[in-house]
């Protein structure tokens, strides 16, 4: 399907096509933004990214359309999808959050996160406390006078997304794990959409941050699909 990817869900392709709807068409499924062929966790993440992370349809299409072929074969077992939820959380904490912190000239705090081990099912009860302590440094360490005016509120967005992802991941157990996995995916999507609404700053700065975020997001999806 060679057409622009658009915002939101649609009744049919004549109205428009988002990333997940394009996947349903590519897979030969009924037209839907919840195709069976796509991993539940990645589908939850990318539905929100499709709608929040882009300034225009051209950017959305350029970044997301190359992912379609790999996504339509990403449906997997519960264990694999849980592993992907862990990856989304770790990417938010160890990639997106440090990027946001360095934007605010908080490199020392970024290094604190980068020195922490990735969260796993085996260590989450102990290591999540270390992440929460590091998040507290952000909450109390941001000086309004030091924040570039055009980035106001963006670090707060990533901070809240990271905090929410940890909370949801720590509760991802039992028969209702998908509810928490979906919350992880939504939090990660918000973190990866942190600069999409900023149109007040230096265009070159905003463009650089946005393209850097897109590159990380594409890498994240490719790594997630590779988990089998």
Q: Where do the language-model regions lie?
A:
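Short, glycine-biased loop/turn motifs at secondary-structure junctions and
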Residues: 1-228
């Amino acid at each position: 399907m060679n057409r622009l990817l658009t915002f939101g869900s649609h009744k049919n392709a004549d109205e428009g096509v988002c990333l997940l709807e394009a996947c349903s068409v590519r897979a030969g499924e009924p037209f839907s933004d919840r195709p069976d062929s796509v991993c539940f966790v990645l589908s939850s993440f990318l539905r929100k990214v499709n709608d929040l992370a882009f300034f225009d349809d051209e950017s959305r299409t350029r970044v997301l359309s190359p992912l379609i072929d790999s996504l339509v074969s990403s449906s997997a077992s519960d264990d694999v999808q849980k592993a992907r939820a862990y990856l989304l959380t770790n990417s938010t904490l160890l990639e997106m959050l440090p990027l946001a912190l360095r934007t605010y000239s908080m490199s020392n705090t970024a290094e604190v996160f980068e020195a922490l081990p990735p969260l796993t099912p085996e260590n989450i009860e102990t290591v999540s406390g270390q992440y929460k302590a590091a998040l507290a440094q952000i909450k109390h360490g941001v000086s309004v006078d030091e924040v570039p005016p055009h980035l106001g509120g963006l670090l707060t967005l990533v901070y809240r997304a990271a905090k929410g992802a940890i909370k949801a991941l720590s509760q991802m157990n039992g028969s209702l794990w998908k509810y928490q996995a979906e919350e992880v995916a939504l939090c990660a999507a918000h973190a990866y959409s942190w600069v999409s609404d900023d149109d007040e700053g230096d265009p070159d700065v905003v463009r650089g941050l946005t393209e850097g975020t897109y590159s990380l997001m594409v890498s994240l999806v490719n790594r997630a699909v590779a988990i089998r």
